[in-house]
Amino acid sequence: MTDLMEVKEKLALSCRLLYREGLLDHGGLIGARIPGDSRMVLNPRTMRGTRGRHPGIMSAEDLVVVDAEGKKIDGINDPPSETPIFTGVFRKRSDVNACFHLHLRWATLFSVVGRPLVPVFHQAAVFGEVPVHQDPNLIQTDEQGRAVAETLGGARALLLRSHGTVIVGEDIESAFTASVLFEENAVRLYDASLLGEPKVLEGKERDETAKRTWNEKVISKIWNYYILKAQSEGLIS
């Protein structure tokens, strides 16, 4: 399997898994760089023959390949309107090879009320301080994409105020895992806030916890768990 085909297959699988977990809706986008290449693979604006896209049935053939500037190179579908998120982030962050733009329900709520989304769940220690990008609009221009990348800085995730999230990873598996944990932390922080004042993971404690809960072994375990879960329910073969 070529690098391009492997990226396409993993990205399409991520679409289906994220949809199964309620994390990827009709407007969410995920993309990845092809190893050793400036090209990117993205889920499309719409799926051929339709007026929309359904991540639950996304296949490798549905995905679109674009260059570093977001121009279409290959694919039966067209790039999404928010492609500048990906061109901006990938241009800024050489360590990032996968970028997910998700409209996470619980995480996004924190940007709506202006409350910091802090790590309270041990597997969310990797996020640390989460920046908030104040532009709530669709990110459709190069200028907006660059601004998102500037707000993200060296973080693993950011909140787009009243819009959604941008979550990045060294590869598709890590971006997927980070997305699951980011939303789980938001749910736990919300629930804990109903009971009292949450104890935040910070400083040395957070750093030490992140070292133990965010590594290749943990990422692989979580990625494979969701694959097996979907297989056990007959959603993927």
Per-region residue spans from a language model:
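Glycine-rich flexible loops
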Residues: 1-237
